A protein has these predicted regions:
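Conserved mixed alpha/beta core segments that line enzyme active sites in large multi-domain catalysts
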Residues: 1-166
Length: 166
């Protein structure tokens, strides 16, 4: 986060942890558990805290690339098997991937395989058009239920101006 003091950063970290745990009881979460036939009270969770590595560009901070790897690929293409896994890569924070946004996808067992698209037009229509950053400027007013209080979604043109798409 962009708090000036270590104490302020610590308090924002504690708020974020509380938000993650309480999110289990949000309506969307309860609806999801009802749909899959599980009792939300039996759910277990853990929190991993990791440093975001990147650079500051004006009032925004973001990594050039973030990724999510999964050991199981529900939609393998060409020679890939489900057990080969899948990787998604995106510019900026991993929220793009986690939220199901457009990202580059490939199978680690076959990294040179062509993408599973039939045309250049299909590739362009399935490409990332925005990215998430950490806002480093003005500290926003506290919002206990906002997951994006310190984040900003920007169009790729902004990253191009930052010089990160070369």
């Amino acid at each position: 986060n962009n708090q000036q003091s270590l104490e302020g950063r610590f308090h924002k970290l504690i708020e974020a942890i509380k938000f993650v745990y309480s999110s289990l009881f949000f309506r969307d979460s309860r609806d999801y558990f009802r749909i899959i036939g599980k009792d939300v009270r039996n759910e277990r969770m853990a929190i991993i805290i990791q440093e975001v590595v990147g650079n500051r560009y004006g009032d925004n901070f973001y990594p050039l690339i973030s990724g999510v790897g999964r050991s199981y690929n529900h939609y393998p293409t060409q020679k890939a098997k489900r057990e080969d896994g899948v990787v998604n890569l995106a510019l900026g924070l991993g929220k793009t991937i986690v939220d199901g946004g457009w990202s580059w996808i490939y199978c680690p067992a076959y990294p040179k395989s062509p993408p599973p698209y039939k045309s250049i037009r299909e590739i362009l229509n399935s490409s990332q058009t925005s990215y998430w950053t950490v806002k480093m400027g003005h500290i926003p007013e506290f919002n206990p239920i906002s997951e994006i209080e310190f984040m900003e979604k920007s169009p790729l043109e902004k990253a191009e101006k930052d010089g990160t798409l070369r």
